[in-house]
Amino acid sequence: MKTFSAKPAEVKRDWYLVDASGKTLGRLASEVARRLRGKHKPEYTPHVDTGDYIVIINADKVRVSGKKAQDKMYYHHTGYIGHMKSMNFNQLMERAPERAIEFAVKGMLPKNPLGRAMFKKLKVYAGTEHKHTAQQPQALEL
């Protein structure tokens, strides 16, 4: 029996809706990254993007354990010498709550062109409203 290898044109992708309210950031992100990669499917193939689309709502209600709200830092560089900017989890949630989930999930995906294609299938919204009702996403309890 030959080993099955999925072909990009034959991959069936579903849309899922995840409610992040009250969920722990890392546990949510690891399951979302797993589904974006397609590792939950029997036809998973490492070199083909077999993952599903994930829509996350209520990103502003995600939580972290312990003192991470004050201690977890996010860094970025502006491009100017000495302009390393930093903010903690609470400041990031005030400024852009969806970015915290995006950073967590992106860090769990492969760092190559395939990983960037997988990340494009993630849609994160701070509130309960999203613009993907036409795709009829199925509710997914994580």
Swiss-Prot record:
The keyword Ribosomal protein applies. GO terms for biological process: negative regulation of translation; translation. InterPro entries: Ribosomal_uL13, Ribosomal_uL13_bac-type, Ribosomal_uL13_CS, Ribosomal_uL13_sf. GO terms for cellular component: cytosolic large ribosomal subunit. PROSITE patterns: RIBOSOMAL_L13 (PS00783). Keywords: Ribonucleoprotein, Ribosomal protein. The keyword Zinc-finger does not apply. One of its GO terms (molecular function) is mRNA binding. This protein is one of the early assembly proteins of the 50S ribosomal subunit, although it is not seen to bind rRNA by itself. It is important during the early stages of 50S assembly. Part of the 50S ribosomal subunit. HAMAP family: Ribosomal_uL13. Belongs to the universal ribosomal protein uL13 family. This is Large ribosomal subunit protein uL13. It comes from Thioalkalivibrio sulfidiphilus (strain HL-EbGR7).
